[in-house]
Curated annotation (Swiss-Prot):
One of its GO terms (biological process) is pyrimidine nucleotide metabolic process. ATP binds at G7, S8, P9, G10, S11, G12, T13, T14, T15. Its EC number is 2.7.4.25. Keywords: ATP-binding, Cytoplasm, Kinase, Nucleotide-binding, Transferase. This is Cytidylate kinase. It comes from the Archaea. It holds the Pfam family Cytidylate_kin2. One of its GO terms (molecular function) is ATP binding. It is found in: Cytoplasm. It is an enzyme of class 2 (transferase). It comes from Methanocorpusculum labreanum (strain ATCC 43576 / DSM 4855 / Z). Signal peptide: none annotated.
Amino acid sequence: MRITISGSPGSGTTTLGRSIAEKYSYRYVSAGEVFRGLAKERNMDLAAFGKIAETDPAIDLEIDARQKEIGESSDDIILEGRLAGWMVENADLKILLCASPECRSTRIAAREGLTEKQAFEMTIEREACEAGRYMEYYEIDILDFSPYDLILNSETFSANELFAIVDAAVSSLLKRE
């Protein structure tokens, strides 16, 4: 089974992805892990590699291509990333987590040690930048939810409730196999 989990920063994709991967003993691959792997391959620290990535579209394109390749050639895997649902066309279940910018900013502030105002401003700026890149590189409108099978509001449901919903969906799909 191939599962993708996408969502904006702070929506809970990592928490959900790791929980589902642990339950089913699936491999978990995040876009962040792919980014770190590319930095390591180039013998660069993350800060330096991140600076290059800001201005070099080839890095984004390579991260997305690697995630697509891993997802389409692997079984029993969870792929987590903003574009995972778009990139892994043969996924069995494509999940999108949503939450308001205010909710996500609160989570990011707590996780990153920022004020909520800082987190909110950073989040809005990052999302606008990403939306532009996704449209430019792939003609993907990040607000088009059509590729997704399951869209959940992580502001409405707790992490445990999200896990239970997705667990039920995965169990149902596994029974079909």
